[in-house]
């Protein structure tokens, strides 16, 4: 949504000078296209999506539940509240990040968790999305609520 008034990521043109336009990146869980600059589009034999410099006001459609509802739905698992470091391979989608948060039992916070690592592949993580919360906090040009993911690899004590 590159034309939202007073939004941080709004711009009439991308970094290549191409006019920006609204587009839906994912519909019903299906990827509609990539974020392509003029250069990357040429390399792939595709058309630019006017995204040189990245996305413009990327908004993930919220679900019906707030964070408390997502925790109840999870029942047992890890609520990640902090990610540490930068361990994402953008070519393969593999990631490994330090994390901290809270362990959940019976839909309630049981205890704090720190010095753990979450790892996996972004494709698998995106496929495992169960729900997106309605608790989004604006952060720059991205807007997304809490995300409930079916399963992730966690290491630590």
Could you describe each region identified by the protein language model?
Residues 1-157:
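Dual-mode signal for accessory low-complexity, basic/Gly-rich regions
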């Amino acid at each position: 949504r590159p034309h939202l008034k007073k939004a941080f990521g709004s711009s009439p043109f991308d970094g290549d000078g191409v006019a920006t336009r609204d587009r839906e990146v994912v519909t019903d869980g299906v990827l509609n296209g990539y974020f392509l600059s003029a250069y990357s589009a040429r390399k792939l034999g595709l058309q630019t999506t006017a995204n040189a410099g990245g996305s413009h006001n990327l908004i993930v459609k919220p679900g019906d539940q707030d964070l408390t509802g997502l925790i109840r739905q999870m029942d047992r698992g890890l609520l990640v509240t902090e990610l540490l470091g930068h361990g994402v391979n953008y070519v393969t989608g593999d990631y490994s990040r330090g994390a901290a948060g809270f362990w959940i039992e019976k839909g309630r916070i049981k205890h704090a968790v720190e010095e753990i690592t979450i790892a996996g592949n972004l494709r698998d993580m995106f496929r495992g999305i169960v729900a997106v919360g309605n608790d989004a906090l604006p952060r720059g040009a991205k807007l997304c609520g809490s995300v409930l993911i079916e399963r992730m690899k966690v290491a630590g004590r």
